[in-house]
Amino acid sequence: MKPTSPSHAALTRRAFLGRSAGGLGAVALASLLKPDLLAAGGLPGFPNFAPRAKRIIFLFMAGGPSHVDLFDPKPKLIELDGKKIPPELLKNHQQFALIRGTPSLKGSPYKFQHHGQSGTIISELLPHLSKVADELTVIRSMHTDTNVHDPAVNFMNCGTLLGDRPTLGAWLSYGLGSENSDLPAYIVLTSGSSDGQPLLQSFWGNGFLDSRHAGVPFRNSGAPVLHLDNPPGVTTADRRRELDMIQWMNRRQSDVLGDPEIASRIASYELAFRMQASVPALAEIKDEPEHILKLCGADPAKPSFARNCLLARRLIERGVRFVQLYDRGWDSHTNIDMEHKRQCAAADQPAAALLADLKQRGLLEDTLVIWGGEFGRTPVAQVSGKTWGRDHHPHAFTMWLAGGGMKPGLTYGATDEFGYHTVENPVHVHDLHATILHQMGINHERLTFRTQGRDFRLTDVQGNVVKEILA
């Protein structure tokens, strides 16, 4: 094989890139890309119209919080507690993930009250969110297509049950680009119970889009991103020689193959180089004023949902387009009383503080905050010995949104008297996605990518903007 043949060039360059990545960690190839290629806008003509929101923080309660215990009180469940579920509720649909037989109805043991001028009804498990009730747009009529965790999380993120499609954050990065060349457009933070539902890389993947649009996970302790520091023994002169060589090889390889994934790899190196300067200071939340730390309940030294909420605000202040916080531990099949109390105690105050903090900084107006999981939980009990929980429930659940041009203080949609089915203004996940994109200035039918002979989009061939919840 001649050294100048295309296949030999590809192998040679890929091997060199692999050795460089291993030897230099994620040291960037700063000379290969112009800075504006990373901070540039997205597709021509996007946004399609003036956006109400410029950025999104998605507080994802992984596992599925119980709507009938948090936002959707059902006196009928309390009245009929212990009675078998009416058979007519179970007709013509997928029923339960794990429950077998005919289960009994289970009323919520928690008290609900009206809060704020809006009178939004919230459970006693969420006393801090109750104080910001007038900021919330509560959707009680969400529904999705599956009661299985991984496909349901994929569906909430990708608009499909499959794990090989772009996520919401990736679509936004693709359509709108990045506002900051020093940070990724899409960042993922995780917290919660270590024995919670596993988090898959597909939940923040790029699918068939360019790999630079994938979410970048930040660690919740220590260095947020590994391998940003130069390894011992690598001098500036050493790095300069390697970068010069890769630049030369990049030009040759582009001439021969024009492989777009090579450009993505180089862009990642460029971004990593810039992150060496931007990330360390960004992650130092101990620099936050004491009253802000107290407001969020955050200990700078401990990984937590509270710490991630603070970090999310710092990220969007610096132009990150989409920040997604996964909080694990909401999958309460047994001992739901203990588990939901634990999860609410960890997530309630930080979520409320995030809204208050964004508002007092003037950021809530154009930042869309989303709270919810992949589905809800059953109005019937899943009994295990002396404890009980609730199974997965895709037919009806609650999510809330705040800021970003939403109508504050509104409770939208309704479920039946058992909280089992949606009966008023149902909102499918595709509708939610269409609405989110609309607030970001995007017509969801125009944000497409052509592959495999057809145009794909986040909302597939469905989805309607829920205009009634918009301010």
Label the model's feature ranges.
Residues 1-471:
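Ligand-binding pockets and gating/stacking loops
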